[in-house]
Amino acid sequence: SDSLSFSFINFDQDERNVIAQGDARLSGNNILQLTRTDSDGTPVRSTVGRILYSAQVRLWEKSTNRVANFQTQFSFFLESPLSNPADGIAFFIAPPDTAIPSGSAGGLLGLFSPKTAQNESANQVLAVEFDTFYAQNSNTWDPNYPHIGIDVNSIKSAKTVRWERREGVTLNVLVTYNPSTKTLDVVATYPDGQRYDLSVVVDVTTVLPEWVRVGFSAASGEQFQTHNLESWSFTSTLLYTAQKE
């Protein structure tokens, strides 16, 4: 179909439209926990979890030169007993058969293989990451502070903005893609109005196949935190764009 729209006000136990990968699971309180916790709810080391929406999304259509105009809204919060919690959560778009790469725990956020994490020609993923861990000795590709980043086929973000991780506080995020300007815009806000903006110009037809899946990924390495998705809505519609030169 030319358009797709869905909305989760929260996540109940019987969520048939979600494909869970790795350690992701629905917790009893209508929250989707992307990374593993022990029996008393404390986050653990070396965990990766992802979820995908079951239906595929038509991102573009070569035969008609149409490209999707899409918008997604989601909210999440992070919790950890540590002073330097890790690693982060990302909204991502990838080919429909996408799976967790081997060795992608920790700073690779469940999205990239260690061998090809910065080799753009080896990847097909567009992601918006919320990265809380930035040790320069290990995550050499990161800026030296917590950040929001837009990743285009690489763990080294195309654009980043400094971000404040707030323990247990919900961050609301809006991501939009405009195919006529080829702009991906991210706006993230905390309840008190603190706001973060970033955008990048990206032609999705050069990054991803015509059909994709959309979802979330999160990971922890030696340091840890919970990655809790509270709500998620997504809508996309194919639009005619100007003929390519």
From Swiss-Prot:
UniProt GO MF annotations: D-mannose binding; metal ion binding; toxin activity
PROSITE patterns: LECTIN_LEGUME_ALPHA (PS00308), LECTIN_LEGUME_BETA (PS00307)
Temperature and thermostability: Thermostable. Retains hemagglutinating activity after incubation at 70 degrees Celsius for 1 hour. At higher temperatures activity drops drastically and is lost at 100 degrees Celsius.
Superkingdom: Eukaryota
UniProt: Mn(2+) binding residues: 129, 131, 142, 147
pH influence on activity: Optimum pH is 6-7 for hemagglutinating activity. Activity drops rapidly at lower or higher pH.
Binding site for a carbohydrate: 87, 107, 138-139, 221-223
Record key words, sorted: Calcium, Glycoprotein, Lectin, Manganese, Mannose-binding, Metal-binding, Toxin
Glycosylation sites: 119
Sequence positions that bind Ca(2+): 131, 133, 139, 142
InterPro entries the UniProt entry points to: ConA-like_dom_sf, L-lectin, Lectin_LegA_CS, Lectin_legB_Mn/Ca_BS, Legume_lectin_dom, Leguminous_Lectin
Function: Mannose/glucose-specific lectin that also binds derivatives N-acetyl-D-glucosamine and alpha-methyl-D-mannopyranoside with even higher affinity. Has hemagglutinating activity towards rabbit erythrocytes. Is toxic towards brine shrimp A.nauplii. In rats, induces dose-dependent paw edema.
Note: Hemagglutinating activity is not inhibited by D-arabinose, D-fructose, D-fucose, D-galactose, D-xylose, alpha-methyl-D-glactopyranoside, carrageenan, lactose or mucin.
Assembly behavior: Homodimer.
Family according to the record: Belongs to the leguminous lectin family.
Record's protein name: Mannose/glucose-specific lectin
The species this protein was found in: Centrolobium tomentosum
